[in-house]
Each structure stands twice: as structure tokens, then as C-alpha cells.
Amino acid sequence: MESGKMASPKSMPKDAQMMAQILKDMGITEYEPRVINQMLEFAFRYVTTILDDAKIYSSHAKKATVDADDVRLAIQCRADQSFTSPPPRDFLLDIARQRNQTPLPLIKPYSGPRLPPDRYCLTAPNYRLKSLQKKAPAPAGRITVPRLSVGSVSSRPSTPTLGTPTPQTMSVSTKVGTPMSLTGQRFTVQMPASQSPAVKASIPATSTVQNVLINPSLIGSKNILITTNMVSQNTAESANALKRKREDDDDDDDDDDDDDYDNM
């Protein structure tokens, strides 16, 4: 910083000396030499702008020359645009009082960033996790069943009766072993009937063996109870005896009819 005495020698222009005197009157004694140049440029620009506006107002009022009224009007209009002063303190207090009467919005219970609704955000996941477990494809028409081991076969024969079939219950005990697969096959289980003791009926009962077809899809892990109705041979013989009796009765009726016809 240089003093005003050093910045205002006698060799300075008259406008610069006048600006230095203004600064001295304002109590500014220390300043840079370029301050005077900037103040001169501002004064020249401001004065030319005011004079241009005064000419416009004078021509609009149809005056031959620019008078003091035109300059005052130009200064007033330019002051409203270029130099704005802050509003009075009382005016600011009234505005602040009105503004503070408005209640503040309620504070939400949750904290965090204020985000718009989810449909307007990109925070939702737009992907899916792929499962690592691979499902083995089941072969078509293939059934896995446990292996069966046929144990003892027991039968309890009952006393046969003429004219009615004799039901006989056969139970097959199974043991669950290692699983095996059967592809649409059927197997045959032969269940022989045990020799029955002495039968009270006069017609002896004959033992028979029946074949039972078992579907593999119906086999489970539990014991299987197979029930068969075994009809003894005496049922067929009784049916044949009844048939022969009916034929004999028919023959006797025919003979009686012939005798009656001969007598006539």
C-alpha cells in the first residue's frame, strides 16, 4: 500500500488529482495507485449513462436541449436499477414475524434420506438368484419299489360246505430290502394250499394252486396281505349232480307224456 501523497504528484492529470482529493476528503489516505484509475472509469461510465438517459427523456418531452430535470429523472431511474439499498429494519421484522407464525411440519418417526416412493426409485432389486440345486429328471414310466423277499406261507383251511364257496385267507410276509426298479413288469406269486386234515364232509376237498398277478405300482413298503377265495372241487361236482338230476327229471316228464298220448 502506498500513501496518497506518493500517488498524487503534480504530474497527474486534473481528473486524477480531483479523485485523489475526494478520497482524502472521505478519510482514505492509503490506497493503491490503480484505485484512482478504477474510480475514474466508474465515474466516466456512470456519467455517460446518465447523460444518454437524459437525452432520451428530453427528446421524448420534445425539448431542444437537456435540462436539469432530465438529468434528475435519469439519475432517479438509474438509481432504482443500479443501486439498491436494503429494506428498512421494521419492514424486515414484520415479514419475519408473519413467517414465524406458520407452524413447522411434524417430524416423521423414522430417520434417513428423504426418497420418493419405491416405484420412482432404482433401489429395488431387479435380479433373481438362481438355485444351485439341480433337479434330476425322473425317467418316464419307471417306478422304484423295495425288493421283496417272500417268507413263510401259512393257510388255515376251513371245513367245506356243499353249495357255498369256502373263503381261504393267505398271508404273505414281506421284508423290505434294498430298493429295486421294475419297469412296467408283472410277476407271479404261487400260493399252494396246505394239505387239510380229515374233513368231516363226505366229499373230500382237493387242494388247488392259484396264480395271482401283482402290479408293481401297487407294492408299498409295508407287509402285503393277499386274500384269495379258493373254491373246492366239490362245488363243481355238486353243480354237475344238480344238472344231471334236472336232466333225469326232464326225461321222466317226457316218458309220462308219451304214455298218456298212447293211452289216448
UniProtKB/Swiss-Prot annotation:
Top-rank taxon: Eukaryota
GO molecular function: DNA binding; protein heterodimerization activity
Residues modified to N6-acetyllysine: K5
Keyword flag Phosphoprotein: yes
UniProt-listed InterPro entries: Histone-fold (IPR009072), TFIID-31 (IPR003162), TFIID_subunit_9 (IPR051431)
Matching Gene3D superfamilies: Histone, subunit A
Keywords attached to this entry: Acetylation, Nucleus, Phosphoprotein, Transcription, Transcription regulation
Feature: compositional bias, Polar residues: 151-176
UniProt keyword annotation of Phosphoprotein present: yes
List of residues that carry Phosphothreonine: T159, T161, T164, T178
Gene Ontology biological-process annotations: mRNA transcription by RNA polymerase II; positive regulation of DNA-templated transcription; positive regulation of transcription by RNA polymerase II; positive regulation of transcription initiation by RNA polymerase II; regulation of DNA repair; regulation of DNA-templated transcription; regulation of RNA splicing; regulation of transcription by RNA polymerase II
Modification type Phosphoserine: residues: S149, S152, S155, S158, S181, S196
One of the record's GO cellular component terms: MLL1 complex
Location, primary (coarse class): nucleus
Entry-linked SUPFAM superfamilies: Histone-fold
Family, per entry: Belongs to the TAF9 family.
Assembly description: Component of the TFIID basal transcription factor complex, composed of TATA-box-binding protein TBP, and a number of TBP-associated factors (TAFs), including TAF1, TAF2, TAF3, TAF4, TAF5, TAF6, TAF7, TAF8, TAF9, TAF10, TAF11, TAF12 and TAF13. Component of the TATA-binding protein-free TAF complex (TFTC), the PCAF histone acetylase complex and the STAGA transcription coactivator-HAT complex. The PCAF complex consists at least of TADA2L/ADA2, SUPT3H/SPT3, TADA3L/ADA3, TAF5L/PAF65-beta, TAF6L/PAF65-alpha, TAF10/TAFII30, TAF12/TAFII20, TAF9/TAFII31 and TRRAP.
Name of this protein: Transcription initiation factor TFIID subunit 9
Organism, scientific name: Mus musculus (Mouse)
